[in-house]
A protein has these predicted regions:
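Short, intrinsically disordered, charge-balanced linker/junction segments flanking boundaries
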Residues: 186-188
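Metal-dependent enolase-superfamily TIM-barrel catalytic cores that perform enediolate-based chemistry
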Residues: 1-66
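Shared catalytic-loop signature of beta/alpha-barrel
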Residues: 37, 43, 54-170, 174-177
Length: 188
């Protein structure tokens, strides 16, 4: 359960670690409110993707009742125009655009401009991949870089040479040209 997982994470990482819960669109409003109460003792930093991305008013309505936990999301929004609508609706406390899905670095910078205008923090979805990492280090994004090496059955770790690795919970992009990686052409 989410409660058991949060308890285990808190016991392993201690009182100061940020614990985030990604519900992947599986909660509704009442479940989010109930889980907020059940998880309160674990000081959850954010609930990610609690509702479907088009339910902006529902997300906005959850922000205050679940405080201090943040309502985050945005990986399923694919344009800066969509993030402008999220801002107008006051739907999310924290934005998580996915640079590979929202139009790349240029679109990501447009999204950051909108976020800055509304004082909304940004932590890119899959920010630990080279594209997200470069946006993080070249902007005022939060210094949080989600990295899931070797999961989902995808050969991502073999696709690129020079991909940064996590060391002691930190990740640094390398300083090679471009994004700092080279395509493994043997996989083509």
């Amino acid at each position: 359960t989410s409660v058991a997982a949060a308890a285990k994470a808190r016991s392993i990482f201690g009182p100061d670690a940020r614990i985030m819960i990604d519900t992947y669109l599986s909660w509704d409003g009442p479940v989010t409110l109930e889980m907020s109460k059940r998880l309160a003792e674990f000081n959850i930093y954010w609930f990610e993707d609690v509702l479907t991305p088009d339910n902006l008013s529902g997300q906005a309505a959850l922000r205050q009742p679940v405080k201090p936990t943040l309502i985050s999301g945005g990986e399923h929004e694919f344009t800066h125009h969509g993030f402008a609508a999220i801002a107008k609706a006051g739907a999310l406390d924290l934005w998580q655009p996915d640079i590979t899905w929202c139009g790349g670095i240029t679109a990501g910078r447009r999204i950051l401009d909108i976020a800055r205008e509304h004082s909304i923090p940004v932590a890119p979805h899959r920010g630990g991949e080279v594209w997200g990492l470069h946006l993080i280090v070249a902007s005022d994004c939060m210094e949080l870089a989600e990295k899931n090496p070797g999961n989902r059955g995808a050969p991502r770790d073999e696709l690129w040479f020079g991909e940064p690795v996590v060391e002691n919970s930190y990740i640094q992009p390398n300083d090679a040209p471009g994004f700092g990686v080279t395509l493994n052409e043997a996989l083509l």
